[in-house]
Design a protein with these regions (language model features):
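Active-site loop-to-helix "anion-binding N-cap" substructures in soluble metabolic enzymes
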Residues: 1-250
Length: 250
């Protein structure tokens, strides 16, 4: 049985003081959660959030990392730096990183392998654009993105050390959402793609839905058999909203 995982991606929002207050407000609301709860904050908030979540069931996540251990990479952060700040999860390959900052399937793979090697759990994002879905490329594209990202990992690592997030790009920040059935079907396709290379590891890897999940649609999406959680954007910026997504089964 795969344990659900709900992760909030705060993107470029919240100062350290605001971040600490948000998780303090959130903690009592999700204390009895049946799923893993993660907040992926801007790096400037790591220290404040790590302190605020002590003694709670909330885990700290980052929004990106470099694959090198150190070096002349201005503006980048290494896995060891993240771990030293209390980070346990890291979002990799988000559509906004791909769109605005030149991330490619190849660099997402480098980051994914480096994260696993360092003992971080990557949340690897894959998904299609609107025109790609309309052209019928969705299934081939998401399987390709997933398998490239996982290249170099063992079946055991894929099963236990990686989370996949299916985020249809056309549903990011648009208010549009894949239907429950569309999301479930595509995540099932991703799982079968993983099975084609990694066998039964596909039954253990957790795959989230990441396209405008919110308090209103979380219950229906999470009722789908293939969907193991959500990567939550806007709805993670308010404690009450995020707690309702986390409490999808309440």
């Amino acid at each position: 049985m795969r344990k659900p995982i709900i992760a909030g991606n705060w993107k470029m929002n919240k100062t350290p003081a605001e971040a600490a207050q948000l998780v303090k407000d959130l903690a009592p609301l999700v204390a009895d959660a049946s799923c893993d709860v993660v907040v992926c904050t801007p790096a400037v908030n790591f220290t404040a959030v790590a302190e605020a979540i002590k003694g709670t069931n909330i885990k700290l996540g980052a929004q990106n990392m470099h694959w090198k251990e150190s070096g002349a990479y201005t503006g980048e952060l290494s896995a060891d730096m993240l771990k030293a700040c209390g980070v346990e999860y890291v979002v990799l390959g988000h559509s906004e990183r791909r769109q605005y900052f030149g991330e490619t399937d190849a660099t997402v793979n480098l980051r994914t392998v480096a994260a696993v090697k360092a003992g971080l759990t990557p949340i690897v994002c894959v998904g299609e654009k609107k025109e790609e879905r309309e052209a019928g490329y969705t299934n081939a594209l998401v399987v390709y993105q997933t398998l490239i990202a996982l290249t170099g990992l063992t079946a055991e690592q894929v099963a236990k050390d990686v989370v996949i997030a299916y985020e249809p790009v056309w549903a990011i920040g648009t208010g549009l959402t894949a239907t429950d059935e569309q999301a479930n079907e595509t995540i099932g396709v991703i799982r079968e793609g993983i099975r084609s290379v990694y066998g039964d590891a596909a039954d253990e890897v957790r795959i989230q839905y990441g396209g405008s999940m919110n308090p209103k649609n979380a219950k229906g999406l999470m009722a789908q058999p293939e969907i193991d959680g959500g990567l939550i954007g806007g709805a993670s910026l308010k404690a009450e909203d995020f707690s309702k997504v986390v409490g999808f089964d309440k």
